[in-house]
Amino acid sequence: MNQSIPVAPTPPRRVRLKPWLVAQVNSCQYPGLQWVNGEKKLFCIPWRHATRHGPSQDGDNTIFKAWAKETGKYTEGVDEADPAKWKANLRCALNKSRDFRLIYDGPRDMPPQPYKIYEVCSNGPAPTDSQPPEDYSFGAGEEEEEEEELQRMLPSLSLTEDVKWPPTLQPPTLRPPTLQPPTLQPPVVLGPPAPDPSPLAPPPGNPAGFRELLSEVLEPGPLPASLPPAGEQLLPDLLISPHMLPLTDLEIKFQYRGRPPRALTISNPHGCRLFYSQLEATQEQVELFGPISLEQVRFPSPEDIPSDKQRFYTNQLLDVLDRGLILQLQGQDLYAIRLCQCKVFWSGPCASAHDSCPNPIQREVKTKLFSLEHFLNELILFQKGQTNTPPPFEIFFCFGEEWPDRKPREKKLITVQVVPVAARLLLEMFSGELSWSADSIRLQISNPDLKDRMVEQFKELHHIWQSQQRLQPVAQAPPGAGLGVGQGPWPMHPAGMQ
């Protein structure tokens, strides 16, 4: 008995857009795709929007579908047809390419034949047409395509079943509306963390011996005429005194689809809770909202999202983020605990090796996100040349939609990037990318009680650095720069760190 053999999906592949698209225009096989001048410099692409113009009679024979098939993003008989996604893929490719320039876009209201006209550029667009490095706004005609995709999104948003309050717990306290931040403000840190009543927890404020530690390690001495080159003095200082690294610092970047990111840095030794709610965490509601010693970080308001549909769907997810996602620091490891009803997916150094499969965070289950010990081991191997790539340290969360998947992260409604600052600094030091200046780094002094094994790792990194320096010409030290390790010169005065 004959059985049909399933067709394997075509893996995505890189295709040069210019020769492929010019060949398609020359082929005349797609209705409306044609040259508009004799020199074959300008061509027209029909550009219908389903929300305004209805389905096309030639919907199955479009340049958008052909590009999706050519790049391996659509396999007939395997993938579900998605004309809006095909159109967005080609639009993004044209926007990024230096070989094409948009000449005319429209008319877009209710035309019988909406279209775009592109110019084939010989040497890329003229300098006057250059765009800012990052443009998060939608161009003309793009909002309709975004809405086409958003219309299909709500049924697929990942929300768990409704949750009832446990009868043994007191009802949560509502925060007075007058204390809410303005709707257009960036992410708000809701005050300093409350002290942990546990006798084992470190007291709030500076750790014991803080001033003595500063006077010992950061005593400036006579300042040289100019600062040493990047990493010349500061790198060994930090490696010999690893407690100077901001081990508890986390850089958090919130991103709503198509909007500029909003970022902040938290320095709480316990971690933080990411949430969106008027419900206030209290000592009596630890089971609902986690420890009050965590930094309380509220998601930014979605009110500046211009698309009504996108803002509606984003609010659908934010409405079930009141319990939040906990990022817990434990030793030199970072963990996540999902309390919220909204499902959360993630990728990062400790994620599953199957990068193409969605990776959910199970509810109320501690999930390891990052290990500094493992990062240091991988950094040592990389510096020795035993691995080809530096160790990863960035962590990405996607709220309410599966991740990783074939959809780019920029198309997700809500994403959050988390970066352990200590890992980023160490990697930048060894790669030479760190620019040391008074405002480039804000050092935070943490508890110096590190494990012996971690101290050995720093010693080995310091040894690697010294070996690298022997292979480079020695720079002439400025007069007065002969300072001992731990004495400076530092680019900021200790008084600025109190």
UniProtKB/Swiss-Prot annotation:
Q: Locate the cross-link: Glycyl lysine isopeptide (Lys-Gly) (interchain with G-Cter in ubiquitin).
A: K411, K412
Instruction: Tell me the Gene3D superfamilies matching this sequence.
Output: 2.60.200.10, Winged helix-like DNA-binding domain superfamily/Winged helix DNA-binding domain
One GO BP annotation here?
positive regulation of interleukin-12 production
**Location relative to the cell:** Cytoplasm; Nucleus
Q: Which residues, as ranges, make up the DNA-binding region of this protein?
A: 14-122
What Gene Ontology molecular-function terms does this entry list? DNA-binding transcription activator activity, RNA polymerase II-specific; DNA-binding transcription factor activity, RNA polymerase II-specific; identical protein binding; protein kinase binding; protein serine/threonine kinase binding; RNA polymerase II cis-regulatory region sequence-specific DNA binding; sequence-specific DNA binding; sequence-specific double-stranded DNA binding
Q: Which UniProt keywords apply?
A: Antiviral defense, Cytoplasm, DNA-binding, Immunity, Inflammatory response, Innate immunity, Isopeptide bond, Nucleus, Phosphoprotein, Systemic lupus erythematosus, Transcription, Transcription regulation, Ubl conjugation
Q: Which residues carry this modification: Phosphoserine?
A: S158, S293, S301, S431, S435, S437, S440, S446
Q: How is it modified after translation?
A: Phosphorylation of serine and threonine residues by IKBKB in a C-terminal autoinhibitory region, stimulates dimerization, transport into the nucleus, assembly with the coactivator CBP/EP300 and initiation of transcription.
The UniProt entry annotates the motif Nuclear localization signal at: 12-18
Query: Cross-referenced PROSITE patterns, in alphabetical order?
Result: IRF_1 (PS00601), IRF_2 (PS51507)
Note how its activity is modulated.
Maintained as a monomer in an autoinhibited state. Phosphorylation and activation follow the following steps: innate adapter protein TASL recruits IRF5, thereby licensing IRF5 for phosphorylation by IKBKB. Phosphorylated IRF5 dissociates from the adapter proteins, dimerizes, and then enters the nucleus to induce IFNs. (Microbial infection) Activated upon coronavirus SARS-CoV-2 infection.
- Source species, domain of life: Eukaryota
Residues recorded as bearing Phosphothreonine in the entry: T10
Disulfide linkages recorded for this protein, renumbered to the chain, are none
- What's this chain's function? Transcription factor that plays a critical role in innate immunity by activating expression of type I interferon (IFN) IFNA and INFB and inflammatory cytokines downstream of endolysosomal toll-like receptors TLR7, TLR8 and TLR9. Regulates the transcription of type I IFN genes (IFN-alpha and IFN-beta) and IFN-stimulated genes (ISG) by binding to an interferon-stimulated response element (ISRE) in their promoters. Can efficiently activate both the IFN-beta (IFNB) and the IFN-alpha (IFNA) genes and mediate their induction downstream of the TLR-activated, MyD88-dependent pathway.
Q: State the oligomer form and interacting partners.
A: Homodimer, when phosphorylated. Interacts with TASL (via pLxIS motif); interaction takes place downstream of TLR7, TLR8 or TLR9, leading to its activation. Interacts with MYD88 and TRAF6.
**What is the protein's given name?**
Interferon regulatory factor 5
Upper classification of the source organism reads: Eukaryota, Metazoa, Chordata, Craniata, Vertebrata
